Structure formats: C-alpha cells, structure tokens
Amino acid sequence: MYTPTYENAFKLLLKRAPFYAYMLVRIPKIIDLENKFPYPAAVAISGGRVVLHWNEQWMAKETPEQQAATLEHELLHIAWKHLTRGRGKNRLLWNYATDMAINCHVKGLPDDVIYPHMFNLPENMTAEWYYEQLLEQAEKNGGKLKIQIEIKNHPWNQPGQNGSGNNQEGE
C-alpha cells in the first residue's frame, strides 16, 4: 500500500528525473504509517535485497519538493553502492560521508541535512574521501566530530539514536 505522500514524491521525482523509474518500481518498499522507523527515509539490505523505508508521518511534514529530493537521495545511495562499500567502516561516519557525497548533487532537500561545509570540507568528493576526513577529525577531537552549524531534528542527533543526543557533535 502506497500513501499519497509517497505517491506524490514518486510522481514528482519521475517527472523531474525519469532515470529513477527503473529503480523505483523494482525496489521493495516498507511504508511506516506509525512513525516507528527512526528516520524520514532510508535504504537497507534485508534478506539479501535492497529495501526502501519511508516514514510517512515524518515525510508528510516536508514539502513535495523535499519529499522527492529525499527519495532521489535514497536512490543515489543504491546507485552509488553505498550499502556495500561501507562494510567494515564506522556506521555513523559512513552515513555522514555518504550523505555529504550525495547531498551536493540533489536540489530541494530538507533543511536539516548534512553538507560538507559543515565540516569545513569541499563539495563533490567521494564518500570514501569524506569518510577518511571525518575519521581524521574525530581522532583529533577525542572521537567527536565538530559540526559547524546546528542541525535541528536530525535523526542522528536525537537521544537513543546513533548520535550523541545534542545537535553539535556526533559519536
């Protein structure tokens, strides 16, 4: 069952970038209607297959453009093979690194996403390059990352998630 929010994001993205049609129709989707999934959207490997998670309540708060951009962001994780290239890496740092690599290329994302400039890093580098830079920064700062601006409501910065629970440093 697809929700109107997901369907609208799907249609808007396909209108803007039909390239994604093949990926979107082939990927199994898990639509969370009860806000149990701790992120707005994500891709994961489940049972050997890539699955798209969509948190309906969270995404319903975003504009249609932000919803479509979020969907594009998740599809780029798949296209750029971020799910398999990150094996053996620190999960939080790899998430930050892959998000920075993608977010430079996607227009219309929600305001609370991560960009390279937040870590004094240049745009348009690979996820591996960002990962090494973040790892180096964390090692220099006793395991903490220094983010340049506050990221309100980012799922990694919520208590009980993968972050430290404040909006300025990640673990």
Feature map (PLM): residue ranges:
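Short, functionally important secondary-structure microenvironments
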Residues: 1-69, 75-171
